[in-house]
A protein has these predicted regions:
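Conserved core of the sugar-phosphate nucleotidyltransferase
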Residues: 1-60, 64
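Left-handed beta-helix
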Residues: 26, 51-52, 58-195
Length: 195
């Protein structure tokens, strides 16, 4: 086996790389964003590849979009009689091709987590819903936290700050005098709403 891929049934197959399956269950063809999709089995972007793929990429030509397409590389593997296995995702999968998709996926993940506290929550903090607070992080007095929310390690949520819902905050983040919701704040950020 030279590759394994994850497939998922989608409602809008024209927007994805699609796998066409033979009657024996093997992959017949992989097509990137076809105008007339033969199936609704999207290639999810999760691959298990052998070093053989590098040799394929060295011979690959840019697509009509002027990109080297992984689907084209997988198709070359098939055309050269290499074996590609696949597995179907039967539970949740979300394409994260746009910022809106990433925010939505973040919301879904947060909604399925349970609260924990490994940091410090001072007095006079209003907490609503599920909150995951990382090691050495502090939520200061005078803040409002609306879950679901996750706060990484070594972060500080200062007074006069409202955070959440549906927000992921990375490590080493400081939030002060601001209101943030439906967001993903990466590591090492400082957000100060003071003017």
């Amino acid at each position: 086996v030279d590759a394994s891929i994850l497939l998922c049934k989608v409602d809008n197959p024209k927007q994805f790389g699609i796998a066409d399956i033979n009657s024996d269950g093997s992959i017949k063809k992989i097509i990137e964003k076809p105008k007339d999709p033969p199936t609704n089995l999207a290639v999810t972007g999760i691959y298990f590849l052998t070093p053989k793929i590098f040799e394929i990429f060295s011979r690959l030509k840019p697509s009509w979009r002027n990109e080297l397409e992984i689907t084209d590389a997988l198709q070359m593997l098939l055309e050269e009689k290499n074996k590609i296995n696949y597995y179907k995702i039967t539970n949740y999968w979300k394409d994260t091709g746009t910022p809106e998709d990433i925010i939505h996926a973040n919301k879904v993940i947060l909604e399925n987590m349970e609260s924990y506290t490994k940091g410090i929550i001072e007095k006079n903090v209003e907490i609503i819903g599920t909150v995951m607070l990382g090691k050495n992080s502090i939520i200061k007095s005078g803040t409002k936290i609306i879950g679901p929310i996750i706060i990484g390690e070594n972060s500080i949520i200062e007074s006069n700050t409202i955070v959440g819902p549906n927000t992921s905050i990375g490590n080493n983040v400081t939030l002060q005098d601001c209101q943030i919701n439906n967001s993903i704040i990466m590591d090492n950020c400082i957000i100060n709403g003071k003017i």
